[in-house]
Design a protein with these regions (language model features):
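Active-site-adjacent structural elements in folded domains
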Residues: 300, 345-346
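Single conserved hydrophobic/aromatic residue that forms the stacking wall/gate
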Residues: 370-381
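Cytochrome P450
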Residues: 175, 346-352
Length: 381
């Protein structure tokens, strides 16, 4: 490969990279995704793969590394777990067809077809089936204490908001544990929320304040759901609308036009649930260990669920313990009914063991993609 900046290929690469400066660019070349320059250095170190030098630019060797297309998901998973965002650039035509053209027109047409980020994963190969994966956004209202969170699990379409306060923000973020957190640059720099955001610095995605505006958020929501009014979804604060709109805008950016399958948006409440600050959660080792193996957690000790959706629900229950006595008693009654009837419990576990991950299967069907395997799994229910 000639890496001279004047070649058509390098001009194409530079143009695509300029559009995604804060991401690694997987540039498709035949059976490999190639990375160049600083991207190559970062990826080679993160993936522990060979860093090579190929071609020159301005007399200097160009760093390069690559991963095979057929095994790309494995490498993407490792990069995402390290906190990278990756723009995947594909060949949009058969290279043999491109060769029939003359001159610079022989260059294979390429473009970024998806952006893979920690909070927008939908592929089974990249997700932990037994843990939620949230993209969240934080919005605040003026200089007061009011704030809001919105979060979406793109794989299942679960879309929620919560009106909260700056004071309670740390506890709510610890409960959600988002993979990515969108927030205005001014909010990130605000000393009043700095402590709450300190745990999530490596997951923050800074936005401009206007990207979390309530009016724009409401319009984006109406467009996404195909409605003229959001009244049927309930009542939302201005901050909730701004946060939810920012989540949708980020999804539209990363999915490159693919339509997400969204469940109805709803505003949540934390009434009846215990608020736990980050330090308390860590020390209790509810779902994450202080050190060592993941088996040293309360979740690992009590998880006997037979489905992925059940495991995610258990995480939800453990990270938001009930405080309402009536709700606790009702849960105890349900548990007692199953404990007393061993045969019903056995049959139920057998049925659940054969049940596919309905939430995420339906989420995939809701996106504008073909998923024959999802249809087949649902047909057996």
């Amino acid at each position: 490969m000639d890496a001279d900046p004047g070649t058509p290929m390098m001009r194409q690469y530079r143009a695509l990279k300029a559009q995604h400066p804060d991401m690694l660019l997987f540039y498709r070349m035949g059976d490999f995704y190639e990375l160049f320059f600083d991207d190559a250095v970062a990826a080679a170190e993160a993936l522990d793969i060979a860093l090579t030098r190929r071609g020159k630019e301005n007399g200097t060797d160009v760093a390069m590394c690559g991963v095979p297309v057929h095994n790309a998901e494995t490498y993407l998973q490792r990069l995402i777990r390290r906190g990278f965002r990756v723009a995947v650039c594909e060949q949009l035509e058969d290279p043999e067809e491109a060769k029939k053209r003359k001159g610079a027109a022989k260059l294979v047409q390429r473009d970024v077809v998806r952006i893979v980020t920690p909070g927008t994963l939908v592929e089974d190969e990249l997700l932990d089936a037994r843990a939620p994966s949230f993209l969240a956004a934080l919005a605040v209202e003026g200089d007061g204490d009011d704030a809001a969170l919105a979060w979406l699990e793109l794989a299942s379409g679960h879309f929620r908001t919560l009106a909260t306060t700056r004071t309670a923000l740390a506890a709510e973020l610890a409960r959600l544990a988002p993979q990515e957190l969108l927030a205005a640059e001014s909010v990130i720099a605000d000393p009043a929320v700095a402590q709450a955001l300190s745990e999530w610095r490596d997951r923050l995605v800074p936005l401009e304040a206007h990207q979390l505006a309530a009016g724009a958020g409401a319009e984006r929501l109406r467009r996404a759901y195909g409605v003229e009014s959001l009244d049927g979804f309930g009542t939302f604060t201005a901050a909730e609308l701004g946060a939810a709109g920012a989540v949708l805008a980020y999804v539209e950016l990363t999915q490159k036009g693919a339509t997400p399958g969204l469940q109805p948006l709803s505003s949540q409440t934390v009434e009846g649930r215990l608020a736990l600050d980050p330090a308390t959660r860590r020390n209790l080792e509810l779902v994450e260990p202080l050190a060592g193996e993941r088996g040293a957690t309360l979740l690992a000790a009590v998880d006997r669920t037979r489905t992925a959706a059940g495991a995610r629900l258990l995480v939800h229950h453990l990270t938001g313990p009930l405080t309402d006595l009536a709700a606790i008693a009702a849960r105890h009654d349900r548990v007692e009914a199953l404990v007393r009837d061993a045969e019903r419990r056995r049959r139920g576990r057998e049925v659940l063991a054969e049940t596919p991950d309905l939430e995420r299967a339906l989420g995939r069907l809701g996106r504008s993609e073909e998923h024959t395997s999802e249809l087949q799994s649902l047909s057996h229910i």
